[in-house]
Amino acid sequence: MAKNKKNKIRGSKRGDELIGTSGRDIVNGRGGDDVITTYEGNDKIKGGNGDDVITSGTGKDKVWGQGGADIFVTENGTSNDPKKGYVKIMDFDRDDKIEFCGCASAKLEQRGKNVWLVKGDDVKAVIKGVDADDLEINFTERFVAFAVDPLA
């Protein structure tokens, strides 16, 4: 399949398992608790309403979890080149989590209005429109989430 071809994959209003291709995918989970996996290509993924698990592969992917408590998984690269891509999370909110390797070399960096999740010199995720001070990185449970406000 040509890498520049766009493949449209659409779920239902119920929970679906949606699997992308090695090309450029446009995935819309629509409703329900979806499990979405993409591979190579610069993909655009929308989870829709529901608590979705979105695993993006190599390429520079743009992801919207939309409604629900979504989990974004960053470790689905199929390439031997770890710098080949990253996921750009467009709407990270309080109920969402990013699952990552849990490596001690991972860190959060504020770059302008975005936070970058970096492992060594490899960018794993760009989180749009959030402040690094509002996030916590948990190496034991291998996730990044909004910090819990102890006064709330």
Where are these regions (language model features)?
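Acidic, glycine-rich calcium-binding repeat modules characteristic of RTX/beta-roll
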Residues: 10, 15-105, 110
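Low-complexity acidic/polar repeat-biased segments
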Residues: 1-7, 104, 109-152
